[in-house]
Amino acid sequence: MMNLQWLIPLLPLLSALLVQLFAARLGKRVAHLSVALGTLTVIVAAYQLVAYIGTDASPSWHSLGTMWGSLYVDPLSSIMSLVVAGISLIVHVYSIRYMTEEPGYPRFFLLLDLMTASILLMVAAGDLVTLLIAWHMIGIMLYFLLGQNTESWPSQRYAFWTFITYRLGDLPLVLAAVLLYQTYGAIDFPTLFSRIAADPNATIMGLPTAITAAFLVALSAFAKSAQFPLHTWLPYTMEGPTPVSALMHAGIVNAGGFIINRFAPVFVHSDGVLHMLFVVGLITALVGSVLMLTQNDIKKSLGYSTMGQMGFMVMECGLGAFSLAVFHLIAHGLFKGTMFLGSGSMIHEARKHDGVPHNPLHTFLVERKSASLKLPWLFIGLATLVVPLFILVIAHWFVAPDFFEKQGAIVLLFFGWITGVQVLFATHHLDANNPIRMMMMILLSFTLIVVGYTFIGHAFENFLYPEEAFRNALYHAAGIDKLTFDGLVFLLALIVVAGWFSSYLASREKSVFGDRFGAVRLTLYSLISREFYVADLYDRMAHWLLDASKRFNVWMRWY
C-alpha cells in the first residue's frame, strides 16, 4: 500500500519529465506518452482503493524519514486520488486532438502533468507542510495553464486575476498551519488530529486554536472554491483552453471542499464556523444559480453553475454532512467535466439553427404563453409536492431510522424535496402522447434515483467516516436552537411554495400584483446581468489603490 501511494503522484511527475526530455524528438506524439502514464496512474489509484476496501485496512501514514514529505492513506485520499486521476486522464485524451493546432503543444501536456501531480499530492498529503506545498503549486500551475495562449491579452489578465485570488487564499491556510503547529507541536495529521481531540479547547494568544484554525481554513476554501464574494475569478477564466476549464471545474475548484473534509477533526469543535460555512455556501449557491440564468455565453453560464454547486458543497459541510459534500464533489466533477468538454459541440450544433428553440419550454418561459396541461393542475400540483417528499422520507427512514434526529439531515431532505419537485414541474415540456404514462415513468425513475442515492449516500458516509460518534458530533456541532430551526424551515417552505404558485399564475398569464412590479423586475434583471456589480466594485477598488500608491510615491519623493 505504501509504495502504491507514492507511485500515484510520482507517475504524473515522471510523465512531465519525459515530455520535457522527448518533446523535441517525438513532437506531438509526446502526448501519447503522457496519456499512457496517465492510464497507469488511474490503474494504480483504482487498485489502491480496491485494496483498501477489500482488506478492511485502517488509515496509515508514510513518511520519507523527515518531519515533512509524508502521505496519508485513508478513505478520503484513496477515493479522491482515483477521481482526480480519472478526470485528468479524460482531459489528457480530449486534449490530444483539441490542442493539436495550438502553439506550445508539448508545453501544455507538461503543465497538465504537473497540475495532476500537484492535485494528487494535495489529496494524499500526510502533513501540513506537504499540503501547503501542493496547495501553492496548484495555483501556480493553474496560472500557466490559463495563460497557455500568450498572445491573448484577456487570457493573461484573467490568469493573473486567478493567481492573485489563489495567493490570497494561501495566506489563511499558512496561518492556520502555524497556529496548529505552535499549539499542538505536530505537523503530521494523525498526531495532530489526536492531540486536537484530546485538548480541543487549547488556546494561543488568548484565541481558541481549533476555532481560529477552522475559520482560517474556511477562508482559504472560500477563495479556492469561488465562494461569494471571492467568486469573480471563476467565470472570467473561460479564455483559457476548454480542457483546462474542464479540469479546473471538475477538479481544481473542488479543492475547497476537500480541504474542509481533511480538517474535519478541527471543524467538529467549531460550531460557529460551521454555521458560517452554511450561510456563505447558501448565499453562493443562490447567487451562482441566479447569475447563471442571465448569461448568453455557454462556458460562462457553466462557470456560474459551478459556483452555485460549490456553494451547495460548502453548505453541506456547514450542515455537518461532510461525506455528502465529498459525494457531491465527485458527482459534480464528472458531470461538469463532461459538460465543458462537450460545450464546443453544442456551440457548433447551435450555429446550424436559427437560435430559437421551438418547444413548449421556450414558449412558456420566453414567449410567456400558456403551457398545455393534459391533467388538472391541482392534481399535478399535489402529486408533485407530496410524492417526492414521501419517497425521500421513506428511503431515508428505511436506511437509517435515526436520520431525522439531525438538523443537517432535515435541511438536506428539504433541498432534496425542492429538487425533486423542480424536476417534476419541468416535465411539462416533454413531448408525450400519454401524459399519465409519462408521469409514471418519471416517478419511477425519480424513485430509483432517490433510493439509489440514499443507499449510496449512507454507505459512502460509513466508508469515509466509519466512527459513528464522530459523524454524530459533526451533525451536533452544526445544529442550532430547535425553535429557530423549525421556524426557518417553515418560512423557507412557505417561500418556495409561494414561488411555485407564482410560476403557475405566470403560466396562465396572470399575476397576483399585475404589472405594478414590471419596473422592479427590469431593474432586478439589469442588476443580475451586471453580476451585482461585484466585479465593477473590485475594478474600482483596484483603481483607487493604484491612484493611492501613485500619490504615496510622489509624497515619498518629496521627503
Swiss-Prot record:
Q: Which domain of life is it from?
A: Bacteria
Q: Which InterPro entries match?
A: ND/Mrp_TM, NU5C-like, Proton_antipo_N, Transporter_DabB
Cellular component aspect of the GO annotation: plasma membrane
What does the record say about its membrane topology? Multi-pass membrane protein
The record lists the membrane-crossing segments as: 4-24, 33-53, 76-96, 106-126, 173-193, 202-222, 240-260, 273-293, 310-330, 375-395, 408-428, 440-460, 487-507
Q: Where in the cell is it found?
A: Cell inner membrane
Q: Name one Pfam family in it.
A: Proton_antipo_N
- Where does this protein chiefly localize? membrane
Q: When the coding gene is removed by deletion, what phenotypic consequences does the entry describe?
A: Required for growth in ambient air.
Mind listing the UniProt keywords for this protein, alphabetically?
Cell inner membrane, Cell membrane, Membrane, Transmembrane, Transmembrane helix, Transport
Q: Which GO terms describe its molecular function?
A: NADH dehydrogenase (ubiquinone) activity
Give GO terms for biological process.
ATP synthesis coupled electron transport; electron transport coupled proton transport
Which protein family is named in the record? Belongs to the inorganic carbon transporter (TC 9.A.2) DabB family.
> How does it associate, per the subunit comment?
Forms a complex with DabA1.
Q: What does this protein do?
A: Part of an energy-coupled inorganic carbon pump.
Q: What is this protein called?
A: Probable inorganic carbon transporter subunit DabB1
Q: Which organism is it from?
A: Halothiobacillus neapolitanus (strain ATCC 23641 / c2)
